[in-house]
């Protein structure tokens, strides 16, 4: 090799090293920028679970304000309307009017994945001192997951279309999700849902540890197996450890099960240890924000891998549609 050739080789090697370093740094920055920050998650929960929201009880101005806040977040993420010209879909229950919230992101396929959580809680009590049931875990944490997923996929091209829903009046009998599921104007949306992820109480560490959730009704479909097969960064969906409590039939997912849509609830709550369920200490201080943020980002990256070929969950013959 001549001296000139040697210099040329050295220069090319140096340039390639610098180029590779540049690409690595930029790809790392881009990847990091796609993630939902802990500050963002805390902000969403703090807004919904603030004292000003007075427990978000159905039929109150604060409940309406919560729905409007979620709708504004859907708008920021450029979601389309599920029906009509608003994210807010009204319904009535015993003479009181409320709103569910629904937005849609179009993908390459008409088939969709749906993500949901309920935003209402149980209001206040008449006792002295702290009398507000803030509902940070139940279920502002689930709403933060739905909004976080909308954030993550805002500028991404996905195979599946995506439906984002926030249900009202869960605490008084799953009323809001039933009203939405029974709304015939939404049949064109619901008829294309391949699977629904209903997020319910994710603010605390599960009995399985960090970065781990459990899924209700795992015995009825292969939903969890398919998620675990595609899971990233150690995310793990465990079987329901509380099957005797029939949680599958006691959360908003059930109103979509009735429509024979694959619909499961996902949670981290340790029901053997939790002392904040429907208690005034269910506030921002109960939230393990780092773990929740990690779960949201890992679900987002896992869902990003899903398409109409590698994720088509099905019910087995154990599920009961008539109840």
Q: What residue ranges belong to the model's regions?
A:
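Bacterial Sec-dependent N-terminal signal peptides
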Residues: 1-36
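N-terminal capping segment at the start of a domain
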Residues: 36-65, 77, 273-279
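Second-shell loop/turn segments in exported
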Residues: 51-61, 89-90, 128-139, 166-167, ...
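A non-catalytic alpha/beta surface segment that caps or lines the substrate-entry region
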Residues: 56-106
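Alpha-helical metal-binding/catalytic segments enriched in His/Glu/Asp
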Residues: 103, 115, 121, 126-173, ...
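Zn-dependent metallopeptidase/amidohydrolase metal-coordination segment
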Residues: 245-292
């Amino acid at each position: 090799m001549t001296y000139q050739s040697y210099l040329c080789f050295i220069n090319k090697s140096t340039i390639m090293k610098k180029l590779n370093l540049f690409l690595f740094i930029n790809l790392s920055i881009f990847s990091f920028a796609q993630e939902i920050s802990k500050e963002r998650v805390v902000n969403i929960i703090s807004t919904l679970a603030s004292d000003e929201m007075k427990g978000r009880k159905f039929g109150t101005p604060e409940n309406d304000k919560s729905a409007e806040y979620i709708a504004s977040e859907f708008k920021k993420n450029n979601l389309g309307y599920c029906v009509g010209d608003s994210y807010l879909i009204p319904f009535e229950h015993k003479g009181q009017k409320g709103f569910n919230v629904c937005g849609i992101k179009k993908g390459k396929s008409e088939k969709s994945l749906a993500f949901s959580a309920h935003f209402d809680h149980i209001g206040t009590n008449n006792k002295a001192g702290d009398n507000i049931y803030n509902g940070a875990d139940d279920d502002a944490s689930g709403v933060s997951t739905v909004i976080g997923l909308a954030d993550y996929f805002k500028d991404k091209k996905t195979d599946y279309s995506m439906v984002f829903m926030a249900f009202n009046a869960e605490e008084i009998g799953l009323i809001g999700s039933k009203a939405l599921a029974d709304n015939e104007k939404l049949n064109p949306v619901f008829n294309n849902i391949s699977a629904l992820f209903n997020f319910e109480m994710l603010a605390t560490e599960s009995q399985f540890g960090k970065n781990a959730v459990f899924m209700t009704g795992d015995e009825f479909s292969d939903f969890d197996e398919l998620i675990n097969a595609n899971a990233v960064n150690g995310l793990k969906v465990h079987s329901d450890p509380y099957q005797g409590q029939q949680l599958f039939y006691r959360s908003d997912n059930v109103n979509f099960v009735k429509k024979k849509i694959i619909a499961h609830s996902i949670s981290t709550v340790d029901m053997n240890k939790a002392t904040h369920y429907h208690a005034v200490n269910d506030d921002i201080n109960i939230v393990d924000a780092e773990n929740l943020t990690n779960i949201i980002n890992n679900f987002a990256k896992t869902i990003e891998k899903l398409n109409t070929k590698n994720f088509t969950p099905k019910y087995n013959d154990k599920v009961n549609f008539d109840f």
